[in-house]
């Protein structure tokens, strides 16, 4: 007669094949047309050129911020920027502007998200009315556009 082993054994995780419900693409909330938007004031500390002009890198950094939120919302991860394409600086951004930055998903891959980005100036100082005078712009001015790809785990 043989005795069964009485030594404790480690529980094993069930092994199930990857299914549509467990793949990264199935867990994502990323959908074409999903849009995220930020608004921010452009501080005078970012002016680098005559006339309080802000460099184009300011827009690219803002695109990175809105893309990070998009990845957190859709995939629960900050993601990583892989590339930019078709970056266009269409109008100036100056210190004191209020800008709106948007990202819209245009393609969803298994681990990648392609987005269209836009910075619009929605408010601007009006020095003619006074040193601290400002006004909202209607319509807003499109300042920077780009397309970018982020990857998520």
Regions found by a protein language model. Give the residues of each.
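Generic structural detector for well-ordered beta-strands
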Residues: 37-43, 88, 147-151
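Active-site helix/loop of acyl-thioester processing domains in fatty-acid/polyketide metabolism
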Residues: 57-77
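Short, structured beta-strand/loop micro-motifs enriched in basic residues and often containing a Trp
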Residues: 78-85
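HotDog/MaoC-like acyl-thioester-processing domains
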Residues: 3-5, 23, 27-31, 94-95, ...
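Catalytic strand-loop segment that frames the active site of acyl-thioester-processing enzymes
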Residues: 2-7, 17-56, 70
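Short, structured protein-protein interaction patches enriched in aromatics and acidic/basic residues
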Residues: 85-95
